Amino acid sequence: MQIVDFLIALLPALFWGSVVIINVFVGGGPYNQIRGTTLGTLFIGFSLLATGHAAFDNLTVIIVGLVSGALWAFGQGNQLKSVHLIGVSKTMPISTGMQLVGTTLFSAIFLGEWSTIVQVVMGLIAMILLVVGISLTSLKAKSEGKSDNPEFKKAMGILLLSTIGYVGYVVLGDIFGVSGTDALFFQSIGMAIGGLILSMNHNTSIKSTALNLIPGVIWGIGNLFMFYSQPKVGVATSFSLSQLLVIVSTLGGIFILGEKKDRRQMIGIWSGIIVIVIASIILGNLK
Protein backbone atom coordinates (compact mmCIF):
# COMPACT_ATOMS: atom_id res chain seq x y z
CA MET A 1 0.00 0.00 0.00
CA GLN A 2 1.51 3.31 -1.08
CA ILE A 3 1.23 6.38 1.13
CA VAL A 4 -0.67 8.26 -1.60
CA ASP A 5 -3.29 5.50 -1.81
CA PHE A 6 -3.63 5.53 1.98
CA LEU A 7 -4.13 9.30 2.02
CA ILE A 8 -6.74 9.06 -0.73
CA ALA A 9 -8.51 6.36 1.30
CA LEU A 10 -8.84 8.92 4.12
CA LEU A 11 -10.64 11.42 1.88
CA PRO A 12 -14.12 9.79 2.04
CA ALA A 13 -14.12 10.32 5.82
CA LEU A 14 -13.11 13.96 5.36
CA PHE A 15 -15.69 14.62 2.65
CA TRP A 16 -18.58 12.66 4.19
CA GLY A 17 -17.86 14.02 7.66
CA SER A 18 -18.01 17.56 6.27
CA VAL A 19 -21.45 17.17 4.66
CA VAL A 20 -23.62 17.79 7.72
CA ILE A 21 -21.24 20.51 8.96
CA ILE A 22 -21.75 22.41 5.71
CA ASN A 23 -25.51 21.75 5.78
CA VAL A 24 -25.78 23.42 9.17
CA PHE A 25 -23.26 26.15 8.32
CA VAL A 26 -25.17 27.33 5.22
CA GLY A 27 -28.49 26.86 7.04
CA GLY A 28 -31.98 26.56 5.62
CA GLY A 29 -33.50 23.90 7.89
CA PRO A 30 -33.73 20.15 7.23
CA TYR A 31 -36.05 20.33 4.21
CA ASN A 32 -33.96 22.84 2.27
CA GLN A 33 -30.91 20.83 3.30
CA ILE A 34 -32.15 17.47 2.06
CA ARG A 35 -33.51 18.94 -1.18
CA GLY A 36 -30.27 20.78 -1.92
CA THR A 37 -28.01 17.90 -0.88
CA THR A 38 -29.80 15.32 -3.01
CA LEU A 39 -29.91 17.64 -6.02
CA GLY A 40 -26.19 18.22 -5.50
CA THR A 41 -25.51 14.51 -5.90
CA LEU A 42 -26.96 14.80 -9.41
CA PHE A 43 -23.91 16.80 -10.49
CA ILE A 44 -21.74 13.78 -9.75
CA GLY A 45 -24.28 11.42 -11.30
CA PHE A 46 -24.43 13.35 -14.56
CA SER A 47 -20.64 13.68 -14.65
CA LEU A 48 -20.50 9.87 -14.60
CA LEU A 49 -23.08 9.75 -17.39
CA ALA A 50 -21.12 12.28 -19.45
CA THR A 51 -17.90 10.29 -19.10
CA GLY A 52 -19.52 7.00 -20.11
CA HIS A 53 -19.69 5.46 -16.62
CA ALA A 54 -23.43 4.74 -16.66
CA ALA A 55 -25.00 1.84 -18.55
CA PHE A 56 -28.72 1.36 -19.23
CA ASP A 57 -28.61 -2.30 -20.26
CA ASN A 58 -29.37 -3.88 -16.87
CA LEU A 59 -32.83 -3.32 -15.39
CA THR A 60 -31.79 -4.72 -12.00
CA VAL A 61 -29.00 -2.15 -11.67
CA ILE A 62 -31.38 0.66 -12.62
CA ILE A 63 -34.09 -0.35 -10.13
CA VAL A 64 -31.65 -1.11 -7.29
CA GLY A 65 -29.92 2.22 -7.92
CA LEU A 66 -33.15 4.22 -7.88
CA VAL A 67 -34.57 2.50 -4.78
CA SER A 68 -31.33 2.52 -2.78
CA GLY A 69 -30.81 6.19 -3.65
CA ALA A 70 -34.29 7.03 -2.38
CA LEU A 71 -33.56 5.08 0.82
CA TRP A 72 -30.37 7.11 1.31
CA ALA A 73 -32.39 10.32 0.94
CA PHE A 74 -34.81 9.04 3.59
CA GLY A 75 -31.90 8.25 5.92
CA GLN A 76 -30.14 11.55 5.31
CA GLY A 77 -33.33 13.58 5.64
CA ASN A 78 -34.12 12.09 9.03
CA GLN A 79 -30.51 12.51 10.15
CA LEU A 80 -30.80 16.23 9.35
CA LYS A 81 -34.01 16.40 11.40
CA SER A 82 -32.10 14.94 14.35
CA VAL A 83 -29.31 17.47 13.85
CA HIS A 84 -31.93 20.22 14.02
CA LEU A 85 -33.07 18.86 17.41
CA ILE A 86 -29.87 17.86 19.22
CA GLY A 87 -26.97 19.12 17.10
CA VAL A 88 -24.26 17.57 14.95
CA SER A 89 -21.87 16.49 17.70
CA LYS A 90 -24.54 14.40 19.40
CA THR A 91 -26.32 13.12 16.29
CA MET A 92 -23.39 11.87 14.24
CA PRO A 93 -21.76 9.39 16.68
CA ILE A 94 -25.17 7.91 17.50
CA SER A 95 -26.19 7.75 13.84
CA THR A 96 -22.88 6.20 12.76
CA GLY A 97 -23.08 3.59 15.52
CA MET A 98 -26.67 2.71 14.64
CA GLN A 99 -25.78 2.33 10.97
CA LEU A 100 -22.88 0.01 11.76
CA VAL A 101 -25.08 -2.11 14.04
CA GLY A 102 -27.89 -2.25 11.49
CA THR A 103 -25.82 -3.09 8.41
CA THR A 104 -23.68 -5.61 10.28
CA LEU A 105 -26.60 -7.49 11.82
CA PHE A 106 -28.47 -7.58 8.52
CA SER A 107 -25.40 -8.83 6.65
CA ALA A 108 -24.64 -11.43 9.33
CA ILE A 109 -28.19 -12.76 9.69
CA PHE A 110 -29.57 -12.53 6.14
CA LEU A 111 -26.47 -12.54 3.93
CA GLY A 112 -24.44 -15.05 5.97
CA GLU A 113 -21.31 -12.91 6.24
CA TRP A 114 -20.39 -14.42 9.61
CA SER A 115 -19.62 -17.98 8.58
CA THR A 116 -17.02 -18.93 11.22
CA ILE A 117 -16.92 -18.99 15.01
CA VAL A 118 -14.18 -16.35 15.00
CA GLN A 119 -16.31 -14.01 12.89
CA VAL A 120 -19.31 -14.50 15.18
CA VAL A 121 -17.27 -13.83 18.33
CA MET A 122 -15.48 -10.80 16.90
CA GLY A 123 -18.73 -9.50 15.43
CA LEU A 124 -20.51 -9.72 18.78
CA ILE A 125 -17.60 -7.96 20.48
CA ALA A 126 -17.88 -5.18 17.88
CA MET A 127 -21.64 -4.91 18.53
CA ILE A 128 -21.04 -4.52 22.26
CA LEU A 129 -18.37 -1.88 21.61
CA LEU A 130 -20.76 0.04 19.37
CA VAL A 131 -23.46 0.11 22.04
CA VAL A 132 -20.89 1.29 24.60
CA GLY A 133 -19.59 3.93 22.19
CA ILE A 134 -23.07 5.26 21.43
CA SER A 135 -23.84 5.45 25.16
CA LEU A 136 -20.63 7.37 25.88
CA THR A 137 -21.29 9.97 23.18
CA SER A 138 -24.81 10.49 24.53
CA LEU A 139 -23.83 11.55 28.06
CA LYS A 140 -25.80 14.46 29.45
CA ALA A 141 -24.18 17.62 30.69
CA LYS A 142 -23.63 17.66 34.44
CA SER A 143 -26.05 20.59 34.73
CA GLU A 144 -28.85 18.55 33.11
CA GLY A 145 -28.97 16.09 36.01
CA LYS A 146 -31.30 13.14 35.57
CA SER A 147 -34.12 15.07 33.90
CA ASP A 148 -35.50 13.61 30.67
CA ASN A 149 -34.85 15.53 27.47
CA PRO A 150 -37.91 15.26 25.19
CA GLU A 151 -35.93 16.52 22.18
CA PHE A 152 -33.32 13.79 22.67
CA LYS A 153 -36.03 11.11 22.88
CA LYS A 154 -37.64 12.46 19.71
CA ALA A 155 -34.25 12.55 17.97
CA MET A 156 -33.58 8.91 18.89
CA GLY A 157 -36.85 7.86 17.25
CA ILE A 158 -35.97 9.88 14.16
CA LEU A 159 -32.50 8.31 14.04
CA LEU A 160 -34.03 4.83 14.14
CA LEU A 161 -35.98 5.75 10.99
CA SER A 162 -32.82 7.24 9.51
CA THR A 163 -30.95 4.01 10.18
CA ILE A 164 -33.56 1.98 8.30
CA GLY A 165 -33.00 4.17 5.26
CA TYR A 166 -29.22 3.99 5.47
CA VAL A 167 -29.17 0.23 6.04
CA GLY A 168 -31.48 -0.30 3.07
CA TYR A 169 -29.19 1.85 0.93
CA VAL A 170 -26.12 -0.19 1.92
CA VAL A 171 -27.50 -3.74 1.76
CA LEU A 172 -29.76 -3.53 -1.30
CA GLY A 173 -26.84 -3.78 -3.69
CA ASP A 174 -25.45 -6.78 -1.80
CA ILE A 175 -28.81 -8.55 -1.92
CA PHE A 176 -29.08 -8.23 -5.71
CA GLY A 177 -25.37 -8.40 -6.52
CA VAL A 178 -25.15 -4.83 -7.82
CA SER A 179 -21.88 -2.95 -7.35
CA GLY A 180 -21.83 0.62 -6.10
CA THR A 181 -19.98 1.91 -9.15
CA ASP A 182 -22.57 0.46 -11.54
CA ALA A 183 -25.49 1.89 -9.55
CA LEU A 184 -24.07 5.31 -8.67
CA PHE A 185 -25.69 7.29 -11.50
CA PHE A 186 -29.11 5.76 -10.84
CA GLN A 187 -28.65 6.25 -7.10
CA SER A 188 -28.16 9.97 -7.67
CA ILE A 189 -31.49 10.05 -9.55
CA GLY A 190 -33.18 8.15 -6.71
CA MET A 191 -31.65 10.50 -4.14
CA ALA A 192 -32.93 13.56 -5.98
CA ILE A 193 -36.42 12.09 -6.30
CA GLY A 194 -36.40 11.08 -2.63
CA GLY A 195 -35.24 14.54 -1.55
CA LEU A 196 -37.98 16.22 -3.57
CA ILE A 197 -40.66 13.93 -2.10
CA LEU A 198 -39.45 14.53 1.47
CA SER A 199 -39.47 18.30 1.04
CA MET A 200 -42.41 18.83 -1.31
CA ASN A 201 -44.98 19.63 1.40
CA HIS A 202 -42.69 22.03 3.26
CA ASN A 203 -41.64 25.62 2.66
CA THR A 204 -38.25 25.81 0.99
CA SER A 205 -36.30 28.68 -0.55
CA ILE A 206 -34.31 28.70 -3.77
CA LYS A 207 -31.34 30.39 -2.08
CA SER A 208 -31.08 27.88 0.78
CA THR A 209 -31.58 24.94 -1.55
CA ALA A 210 -28.88 26.28 -3.87
CA LEU A 211 -26.39 26.67 -1.01
CA ASN A 212 -27.10 23.11 0.08
CA LEU A 213 -26.08 21.81 -3.33
CA ILE A 214 -22.50 22.12 -2.06
CA PRO A 215 -22.65 19.29 0.52
CA GLY A 216 -24.35 17.07 -2.06
CA VAL A 217 -21.47 17.53 -4.49
CA ILE A 218 -18.99 16.94 -1.67
CA TRP A 219 -20.75 13.71 -0.67
CA GLY A 220 -20.61 12.49 -4.26
CA ILE A 221 -16.90 13.26 -4.56
CA GLY A 222 -16.30 11.34 -1.32
CA ASN A 223 -18.11 8.39 -2.89
CA LEU A 224 -15.82 8.50 -5.93
CA PHE A 225 -12.75 8.49 -3.68
CA MET A 226 -14.21 5.48 -1.85
CA PHE A 227 -14.63 3.51 -5.07
CA TYR A 228 -11.12 4.48 -6.17
CA SER A 229 -9.49 3.48 -2.89
CA GLN A 230 -11.19 0.09 -2.39
CA PRO A 231 -9.13 -1.80 -5.01
CA LYS A 232 -5.98 0.04 -3.89
CA VAL A 233 -6.07 -0.55 -0.13
CA GLY A 234 -8.74 -3.25 0.18
CA VAL A 235 -12.39 -3.20 1.21
CA ALA A 236 -11.68 -3.73 4.92
CA THR A 237 -9.19 -0.86 5.16
CA SER A 238 -11.25 1.56 3.07
CA PHE A 239 -14.39 0.75 5.07
CA SER A 240 -12.62 1.23 8.40
CA LEU A 241 -10.99 4.51 7.34
CA SER A 242 -14.28 5.86 5.99
CA GLN A 243 -15.85 5.49 9.44
CA LEU A 244 -13.46 8.17 10.69
CA LEU A 245 -16.09 10.56 9.32
CA VAL A 246 -17.57 10.48 12.82
CA ILE A 247 -14.48 12.29 14.11
CA VAL A 248 -14.68 14.95 11.40
CA SER A 249 -18.38 15.63 11.88
CA THR A 250 -18.38 15.50 15.69
CA LEU A 251 -15.38 17.78 16.16
CA GLY A 252 -16.65 20.04 13.39
CA GLY A 253 -19.92 20.42 15.28
CA ILE A 254 -18.06 21.43 18.43
CA PHE A 255 -15.27 23.62 17.05
CA ILE A 256 -16.74 25.00 13.80
CA LEU A 257 -20.43 25.24 14.66
CA GLY A 258 -19.75 26.09 18.31
CA GLU A 259 -21.90 23.41 19.95
CA LYS A 260 -21.31 23.63 23.69
CA LYS A 261 -20.13 20.63 25.70
CA ASP A 262 -18.95 20.42 29.28
CA ARG A 263 -15.87 18.47 30.37
CA ARG A 264 -17.87 15.33 31.19
CA GLN A 265 -19.48 15.30 27.74
CA MET A 266 -16.17 15.93 25.97
CA ILE A 267 -14.59 12.96 27.75
CA GLY A 268 -17.61 10.84 26.81
CA ILE A 269 -17.52 11.99 23.17
CA TRP A 270 -13.80 11.31 22.75
CA SER A 271 -14.06 7.94 24.49
CA GLY A 272 -17.15 6.99 22.48
CA ILE A 273 -15.55 7.96 19.17
CA ILE A 274 -12.48 5.85 19.95
CA VAL A 275 -14.66 2.86 20.85
CA ILE A 276 -16.80 3.27 17.69
CA VAL A 277 -13.71 3.50 15.50
CA ILE A 278 -12.25 0.35 17.10
CA ALA A 279 -15.54 -1.45 16.46
CA SER A 280 -15.59 -0.28 12.83
CA ILE A 281 -12.03 -1.58 12.32
CA ILE A 282 -13.07 -4.98 13.70
CA LEU A 283 -16.13 -5.03 11.43
CA GLY A 284 -14.08 -3.92 8.44
CA ASN A 285 -11.73 -6.86 8.90
CA LEU A 286 -14.67 -9.28 9.04
CA LYS A 287 -15.67 -8.33 5.48
Curated annotation (Swiss-Prot):
UniProt entry tagged with the keyword Signal: no
Keywords: Cell membrane, Membrane, Sugar transport, Transmembrane, Transmembrane helix, Transport
Gene Ontology CC terms, in alphabetical order: plasma membrane
Location within or outside the cell: Cell membrane
Main subcellular localisation: membrane
Transmembrane segments: 7-29, 34-56, 58-75, 114-136, 156-178, 183-202, 209-228, 233-255, 267-286
One Pfam family hit: Sugar_transport
Bilayer topology term: Multi-pass membrane protein
A single GO molecular function term of this UniProt record: carbohydrate transmembrane transporter activity
Tree of life domain: Bacteria
Xref: CDD domains: glucose_uptake_GlcU
Family, as annotated: Belongs to the GRP transporter (TC 2.A.7.5) family.
Cross-referenced PANTHER family: TRANSMEMBRANE PROTEIN 144
Its job: Involved in the uptake of glucose.
Record's protein name: Probable glucose uptake protein GlcU
